[in-house]
Every structure is written in structure tokens, then in C-alpha cells.
Amino acid sequence: LAPAVVLPKPWADALPKPWRLTLAPSPEEWSPEERERVDLLVMGDGWLDPQAADAWQPIASEPLIRQLDDQARALLDQLGALQSRVLPLAVSPWVMLFRDDQAMAQQGWSLLLDSALAGRVVLPASPRLVMSLADHLGGGNVLNELRRQALTFDDRQATNWLLKGDARLVVLPLNRCIALLRRDPRLRAVLPASGAPLHWTLLLRPEASREPVPQSWVQQGWRDPLRRRLVQLGWRAPIT
């Protein structure tokens, strides 16, 4: 079970039988019954609930865990009781996407607070990710200022807001921008030199699951040639 666009299509297509991918709305809309009917869940890190660790069971895939790089291990270290129950599958930086404007492109994350963009910015729906963006802008009282800049909090429909003209800037993971950038040369995605929050694609095993993680399938996405294909789509394998 995974929301649309969270799992790269070439990787999803490589799922071996009898595994089958079911696409669903965003994680906050998943019912307990839906979670109980599936053996694996894929979601973005913005929707993790550290208070719900009992809903998941340990990943129990030490050969995969040993390969994780420092950034992935740092993520797990922040997850408390969820640490052993989450497997980072892929990572992509958050970027700012807007119609090509050289002046805007040079400002970095501070562009999000530009008064000229008040009410014209689309931010991620996850409060956790909005707080991470605020940290990149200096933290403190910046969070309230950032929220006031928002037209809406809707990364699922962010590109629609931008293309219709209601928004001037949207914040999205790079992997969500690649296809659009190829189709529309008027758009630009900017990854500020100061760095960016990371969007993690995570694998979890519901408490009722009796199926182990399909390790060979995970390894396939972490190794060439599929790994190269995923990089072209804006995803990076979280391994050393």
C-alpha cells in the first residue's frame, strides 16, 4: 500500500510475484482496516507518528540496515521507538519550483518569506516538513511567518496550483518535479546552496503482517541498472 507518486514507478513495476502494489490516498486518510489488510506500507517521512510505534513491527532485515549511509542512520536515530520499524528506501531533496525567474532563483530559502509572495506559496501538507523548512530559515518565530505566506498546504496538488497561476512558488521533492521540468521549459526547480530538508520514502511492516521484507527487491532498487534510472527520476538510494 502506498500513496501515488511516493514509490518510483520503475521500482514498483519490479515487484516480484505474488507481491502487488495498491495505490491509496495520502497516509492520513488510511483507515485501520486498510493497514491491517496489507503486508507492507510505503510512505513519506512527513507522516510518521512516533507515538504509534506499536502499529508497526521490526523491519528485521539486518543485511539492508547495514548498508544505510550516515544520513539514513541519522534519520533513524531521530525516530525513537520507530527506529527499528522503519527502512529508508530512497531520498530526494525538497526544492522550490516556480516559473523561471533569475532574481527569484538567486535568493535561496529566504525567498519563501518574500513579501511579494505572501499568499502565493504552496507548502507541504505535513506539519513536520513545514517545521523543517522553518529551521532552514533560522527557526524561532520564522514558523508563524512562513505559515502566513502560504496559499495552502497541499503538496499533492501543488503543481496544479502553480500551473493555474494561483501560486507563484511551490515546495516539492525533486522527484516530483523532474517530469514537469522536462515538459515545461518555463519552470525552474531550485535547490539552495545552503542545503535542503530531505524527503524520505520509507518502508514499514504493519503489526499484523506475517510477510518478511522482500530484500532482493529492495536491493534491486539500490543497485544498477535500476539505481541509475531512479537517480534520473530524482531519487537517491540511501546507502554507502
Positions of predicted regions on the chain:
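Early extracytoplasmic/lumenal segment of secretory-pathway proteins
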Residues: 1-52
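Alpha-to-beta junction loops
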Residues: 18, 34-43, 117-119, 163-172
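A structural signal for short loop-to-beta-strand junctions that line the ligand-binding cleft
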Residues: 38-40, 56-95
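Ligand-binding pocket segment of bilobal, Venus flytrap-like solute-binding proteins
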Residues: 45-50, 122-192
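Short beta-strand->loop
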Residues: 58-68, 86-88, 182-197, 206-207
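A bilobed periplasmic-binding-protein/Venus flytrap-type ligand-binding module shared by bacterial periplasmic
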Residues: 95-102, 198-214, 229-230
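Flexible hinge/capping segments at coil-to-helix
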Residues: 103-117
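Periplasmic-binding protein-like
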Residues: 120-126, 220-239
